[in-house]
């Protein structure tokens, strides 16, 4: 079994991928790419492209071909057997697919028509959306945002290795907090951290999150607070508002020498248990040795059981993922204990427990209501309400 506690963790698959073309070669490659068939990428595919290119999705070197796709959907493994739980695919229409052959090189462009990468087409194949939805999202209900996105995709998937011509350095969100995997790994080494726990969130950090993070921090050297700032649901708190709330919280309530705030610029899939495994693998590539998995991780609505995201890790052999999941129950504020707790540490009945869901708190914030201090630090609430007022104004 891999002892991640005492080693510099190896990237998933053994090598940290870098698919960026050297700067000196980019202009020539762009000019050549201008003559190629072109595929325009939406926000999610652009995000995936960036994650592939910088190594966050190691060992992927491009969008998945048929063998990897089918293996991931059916078995949560790449074709070579390596654990991987979410399909990373590029879809096109049937008409677009007829404009190139397997073996051709195509240009990948953003919404403004700028060529950002090229791809050598290794595979073109059709797929069963409903089958993917059932296995990956556990539902075919198009009210589920991940399923809805899947059913909006083109009819043909295109797989192949990518070469980035634009690594996004001039357009990256929150550049102060943007770190590539190799950069975060260097920071962890510089700080002397051998055991690093990662925490994923798309919500403001509330007292339950703070309790979980600090409980984990008691057992490791450092905490990576790694909020997702890619594509999310329309009713999620905007990333710029959340980021300010994280800054305030870390400045006032966390040890600065044991925490790092860095954005995770991936798109949210809302795939629940499967996405929990996927998020753990991504944090392994960033250099984390441990990853926090809370209640209904990456869930939405009532599609997943409260602790399904814990149980899915049992489907892998101990040490096989190469990162240690830390499972936490739903934390609450106990009026009798006078602090945060879980059912593992609190003897009192539910009448004394104060629970707040992210959905309920978002509603309160948008209505200008102040959630009680049992939910979140007052400074954080001020930032959130102020930010939402400015957005709506």
From Swiss-Prot:
Q: In which pathway does it act?
A: Sulfur metabolism; hydrogen sulfide biosynthesis; sulfite from sulfate: step 1/3
What Enzyme Commission number does this protein have? 2.7.7.4
Coiled coil segments of this chain: none
Q: Which GO terms describe its molecular function?
A: ATP binding; sulfate adenylyltransferase (ATP) activity
Q: In terms of domain of life, where is this protein from?
A: Bacteria
The record lists the catalysed reaction(s) as: sulfate + ATP + H(+) = adenosine 5'-phosphosulfate + diphosphate
Q: Which CDD domains match?
A: ATPS
Q: Carries keyword Nucleotide-binding?
A: yes
Which GO terms fall under biological process for this protein?
hydrogen sulfide biosynthetic process; sulfate assimilation
Segment forming the signal sequence: none
- Keywords assigned by UniProt, alphabetized: ATP-binding, Nucleotide-binding, Nucleotidyltransferase, Transferase
Q: Which family does it belong to?
A: Belongs to the sulfate adenylyltransferase family.
Q: Which NCBIfam families match?
A: PRK04149.1, sopT
Record's protein name: Sulfate adenylyltransferase
Task: Please name the source species.
Answer: Rubrobacter xylanophilus (strain DSM 9941 / JCM 11954 / NBRC 16129 / PRD-1)
Tell me the classification of the organism that encodes this protein: Bacteria, Bacillati, Actinomycetota, Rubrobacteria, Rubrobacterales
Q: What's the gene?
A: sat
